[in-house]
C-alpha cells in the first residue's frame, strides 16, 4: 500500500498529501480488525498476476497455455463499492482516486459488515481462461466460481436502443 501510495501521488502532487495518509490509516482501522487483509491481498495478487508479463509467461509455459502476445491480461478499472477504498486504489485494484471523487470507504467496508465485500473487476474475455486457471492453481479449484448474467430486452426496448444508437429522433 505504501509503495502504491507513493506511485500514485509523488509524481502528481510532489508528495503524498496528509489527507491520503489519514484515509489509509482510517481504512486500516476497519480492514485489519475485521480480518479482510488476506482477502484484499488475494485480489491484489490476481491483479498483479494479470499485469505482470513475466508471471503470465511463466505460468502459461508451466501449464501449456498460449499467453497473450505482450504477457498482459487486460483488466477493467474496478467497479462498485471498492472504488471508495484508498487501500484498493493504492494497490492498483481500482483506478479511481476516492478522495478526488468524494467516494466513501464506508460503502465498501464498515465495522457492522460481516460478509466479505465485493471487489468487482473484469478480466478480458479473450484471456479469462488464463486468469481462472491461475486462481484455481493458486487458491484451489474448490474456491473458484464463475457467474454469468443473461439479460433479456423487450421488442420496444430493442427498437428504442437501436434508434437511439443510430441518432434517429424519437
Can you name each region flagged by the protein language model?
Residues 1-170:
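Alpha-helical scaffold/interaction cores of sigma-54-like transcription cofactors
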Amino acid at each position: 500500500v505504501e509503495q502504491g501510495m507513493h506511485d500514485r501521488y509523488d509524481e502528481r502532487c510532489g508528495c503524498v498529501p496528509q489527507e491520503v495518509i489519514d484515509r489509509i490509516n482510517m481504512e486500516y482501522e476497519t480492514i485489519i480488525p475485521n480480518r479482510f487483509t488476506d482477502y484484499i491481498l488475494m485480489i491484489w495478487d490476481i491483479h498483479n498476476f494479470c499485469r505482470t508479463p513475466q508471471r503470465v509467461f511463466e505460468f502459461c509455459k508451466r501449464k501449456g497455455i498460449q499467453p497473450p502476445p505482450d504477457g498482459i491480461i487486460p483488466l477493467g478499472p474496478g467497479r462498485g463499492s471498492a472504488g471508495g477504498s484508498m487501500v484498493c486504489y493504492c494497490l492498483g485494484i481500482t483506478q479511481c482516486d476516492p478522495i478526488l471523487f468524494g467516494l466513501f470507504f464506508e460503502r465498501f467496508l464498515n465495522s457492522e459488515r460481516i460478509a466479505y465485500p465485493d471487489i468487482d473487476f473484469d478480466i478480458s474475455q479473450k484471456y479469462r481462461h488464463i486468469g481462472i486457471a491461475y486462481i484455481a492453481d493458486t487458491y484451489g479449484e474448490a474456491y473458484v466460481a464463475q457467474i454469468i448474467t443473461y439479460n433479456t430486452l423487450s421488442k420496444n426496448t430493442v427498437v428504442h436502443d437501436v434508434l437511439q444508437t443510430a441518432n434517429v429522433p424519437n
